[in-house]
Amino acid sequence: MIASLPMYARPENRAAHSALWALIRDGLRARALPAPDGLDFDTPHMQGWARPDLVLGQICNLPYRAQFQGRVTRIGCFDYGLPDCPPGQYYSQFVVRRDDPAASATDCAEAGYVFAYNEGLSQSGWGAPQAWAAAQGLALRPGPKTGAHVASLQAVAEGRADWAATDAITLRMAQRWQSALTDQLRIIGRTAPSPGMTLITRQGQPPQPYAAAITEALAQLPAEIAQILGICGFHSLPQSAYDIALPSPPQPA
């Protein structure tokens, strides 16, 4: 069996994630639910989400909507306390180089700026930015596919792309632990919110005892651990929150 919290995992918060998992694990076991001793930090995301022995996973809402809805049980979302954002949701922030003359994300799209994205199955890196552009009657000009949000930030800083959109929580962590990179960048806008990284378990499991164990664990989590993780709550979102049209895949020039 496997448990993983991969979406905001970094070396700097690995011990904090493990401490949170220990509390969740004990809560699950107290409810007669099997749970592994420790988190898995090595299994690729897609493989972990598809495991028939998945105890707890964390998935971006776009791959959930596109490929895993009906294949896993949705539990809820951690709340990371983003300003001007509903609990349990998140948004992307657009960035350019600090010395770029663009005043807004609209300026970037209208000028045909080259857009770095982590992958086409990322809500924050591609899905939400594309929806933002479509709502403005604009289009993105896809550039390098970087494979990771931080790599997209690096692509912009190094001039391999003109702008990018990154998960606001990932950006907040990069500002904390990679300030030499983020100091080269400037935020110029944001997308609409959508469901945050969603906690899931294997298909056929009732979500309620998992949600109860997670809520209980957060109540017991030491404040200094919660501060490292940036987690301030847990929310179970309705299915309607996930009723979002799927984006078209990027079509690089």
Regions found by a protein language model. Name each.
Residues M1-T73, C77-Y80, D84-Q89, A223-A253:
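N-terminal hydrophobic or amphipathic helices and topogenic motifs
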Residues P52-L54, Y90-S92, G112, G196-M197:
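Short, surface-exposed beta-edge/turn micro-motifs
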Residues S124-W126, S152-A155, R172-Q175, G196-T198:
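Short acidic/glycine-rich loop or secondary-structure boundary segments that cap or lie
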Residues I2-L23, P86-L153, A226-S240, I244-A245:
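Bilobed "Venus flytrap"/periplasmic-binding protein-like clamshell domains
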Residues V55, I59-Q69, A157, D162-D183:
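A ligand-binding cleft/hinge motif common to bilobed small-molecule-binding domains
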